[in-house]
């Protein structure tokens, strides 16, 4: 295919970008002034007000970590997308930066959609993102019209940028509207870009482009097509090399699949983010060697984006509310990101994701409970009021007989709680929200391998924030992210055993300090 990659960027300014950014800042500030903090995160990244979704433009640049994110500054529901921005010198203490992008060009007049950041050969950063327009000019009933855009920062602090314009147009006869979320990297002496596409046949694909100068791009081929015909779009694609413990290189392809049907424990969310591990050689398509696996098994995880800081592959995900009711929308804000996770390729041949080491810097006021034993249907309160904590716990599976055992978090006087438990009957870790007083309910499970079950030991690392929980199983072999809307009053944490006994080898509770964005 040719004819849709211009020799130079194309742009048509229709609004003053500076004025639009000023309006957006005022929109966020209006929500922030009235925000209810009952579920607003203490140590997760969120906007000061308004709606957020996908993490964007993740990078480590000139000594600072930068996290951008999709932002609707004028509502707590999804709307015209902007780019919000926070930065940090240590991944522990964060500061708010000016909003980076607002719609101001004809090519993006209905939204500055998701994209990524990459450092070029000259050491300078470039942003690639999707410009979004409604095909009928006013709403989503006629589908999308999307193109890929380039922007360059005006300073090393990344507090403003100059939009260069469209670098890849959309061949509308080959695409069923969805055409977005560019990811750029370099292999050898050539730059590559991939993004998600819904083909004319409504198949979820990732297309591959190449460039010598990061401006003029050439279509190469379909990098990957999802084998499931129900999957019509692969959002927020990711693609990166990773080495195992022996130094052997594999390639990871990640995407958020739209259209997959639920089956058993798999694909229970509206859309599901996952990956495959395989091989790739420039000039060829990606060759998967594994099945599709979820990045995260919780209720509320989507649109992850990873980046390499020179030593580690780090990923942030968006905690997506997915389905109503969404009570935080009444509080002047909606949505937050997960903790940053380091991706490694384990000896078991699978990806592990665990919080980056810097997260230990959030701990304060630690209590070590040592070993704990509970009798049949036993219960022990380990915190009377835990607003923001991390719990490290190791369960002795061989010495426990409980059918389910674990932690009731956000346990309030009205009887509401969220349950993080090991379920012995199904051999899985569970986040169960059946007792939640607000928000969506249901439960999600993370699998344990036969090897893990046979080990007789289960390690859980549980991060509880004001309105969400993240669970890391056995040093990150599985991860789970779910919203948990606590009721009014003290929020206790209780260790419980159901229909049997529980033996905990160790339990440590850390109260967590703020990351500075409240």
Language model segments and positions:
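Beta-rich carbohydrate-recognition and catalytic domains
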Residues: 2-181, 186-234, 243-297, 312, ...
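Beta-rich accessory regions
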Residues: 3-5, 25-31, 246, 279-518
